[in-house]
Amino acid sequence: VTYGLHLQPTEDGKTQVSRETIELRASKNEGNGKGRRQTLLDHAVSEGELGLLDSTMSPANKWGSLKSVRKAEARFRQEETLSWSQYRSFVFSHSFMDTLTAIDGEISKNDVLPKIKMAARDMNRQLIDVLKILSQYARLNMRVMTTREGASVAFGYVPIEHGSNFDVLDIGRPVIVPEDLRLTIEQMVKQSNIVLPTVVPNLQLECDMQEAVTEDKKPGVRVFLKSVRSVGDKEVHIPFWAESEGVKRIVGMLSLLTRMFNEPDACIAIDEIDAGVFEILLGNILRVLAERGRGQLIFTAHNLRVLEVLPSKAIVFSTSNAKNRFLSIKGVRDTSNLRDMYIRSVNINDQPEELAPRISPSRVAVAFNKAGRVAEMTVAPTVKEPEHAQ
């Protein structure tokens, strides 16, 4: 199964899904031994001059037959408009799947079908099965840690992966969580205590757990995280909230990175993976994941250490142009230092797009000087002393 999509930048800096395709390749053991490719859906949409959407669905003959089913085309158009306005996928919407299922139910009411209608029904059933498989794959194997989850450590929380979602654990105090989070927290601590000492020497986690009742009178667990550091022959126990932001950030990502390292089907996306993490430590972790990880890791970062540990083909740079936001640096050789090339490109602007706005050190110095004079010119109001009675 192959799922493809085209992304179209908008004037307000967002991204529209302008085309989605789903193809099915037959097994090489079938037919003449060559994997025959079958297009189940090629859906393209664009915005016309008056703001109305123009769309096509291919193969045209089969989808034309499916659209002829009662209310099907109207439901497709409604979902196209909604998904376009919300900048999301049309194919993976619940409404699209519901419409396909309803179409199959309507067609199946007829005992005798024309050849084209029968072919359309068979394709529709294949598409329903494929979408279920892809949706299940995404729920089980794809995880996205946004800036919101990552930044939670700055506010005394650690993100924890729970099923296909993220929860946050308050680490600033003992907290009562639902009973079904017990295994998730225990797994997080266990994984951390295997990996943490290899990247942060002499550091482990400890979790105090006690039976409790939640605010809604359901079974819960009272949880308080601590860190344990070995200092000579002694162990020093401190609340986990007192650890550095980088350590808390790593603990929050460990379950995801562990899955990426071990599972070939895992696809993990992390926004600003470098936030608060010591750059040498970040580089060592990324190098191991790149060389030995079995899954796929997609991330954004500001730290240039990444350019020294990852192959250039795995890196895409952002630009200042909202209409052409990403590019690869040209002229990179095996012996090139990508970090030096990037810094030079920013300074002399030798790439097709500007990688970052150029900043004049002299103008920055002048601005600081002016800002300082503003403070000097600010005069505190004087308070008039009361007159004493003569």
Regions found by a protein language model. Give the residues of each.
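Conserved nucleotide-sensing/catalytic segment adjacent to the nucleotide-binding pocket
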Residues: 1, 235, 338-340
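Post-Walker A helix-loop "phosphate-sensing" segment adjacent to the P-loop in P-loop NTPases
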Residues: 259-263, 290-293
